[in-house]
């Protein structure tokens, strides 16, 4: 958490969207791999 906070503070606007995109991709990949099936279903 501390690391994410520092990164966000360092570049607010380039890291935030990137993190959100990664989160979205990870969430989409998770159900495909068998991680989070609730949101996908």
Swiss-Prot record:
InterPro entries: Histone-fold, Histone_H3/CENP-A. Keywords: Chromosome, DNA-binding, Nucleosome core, Nucleus. Its main location: nucleus. It comes from the Eukaryota. GO terms for cellular component: nucleosome; nucleus. Transmembrane segments: none annotated. Residues 1-41 are annotated as: Disordered. GO terms for molecular function: DNA binding; protein heterodimerization activity; structural constituent of chromatin. It is found in: Nucleus; Chromosome. Core component of nucleosome. Nucleosomes wrap and compact DNA into chromatin, limiting DNA accessibility to the cellular machineries which require DNA as a template. Histones thereby play a central role in transcription regulation, DNA repair, DNA replication and chromosomal stability. DNA accessibility is regulated via a complex set of post-translational modifications of histones, also called histone code, and nucleosome remodeling. The nucleosome is a histone octamer containing two molecules each of H2A, H2B, H3 and H4 assembled in one H3-H4 heterotetramer and two H2A-H2B heterodimers. The octamer wraps approximately 147 bp of DNA. Belongs to the histone H3 family. This is Histone H3.2.
């Amino acid at each position: 958490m501390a690391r994410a906070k520092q990164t966000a503070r360092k570049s607010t606007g380039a890291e935030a969207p990137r993190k959100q995109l990664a989160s979205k991709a990870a969430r989409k990949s998770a159900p495909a791999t068998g991680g989070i099936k609730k949101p996908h279903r």
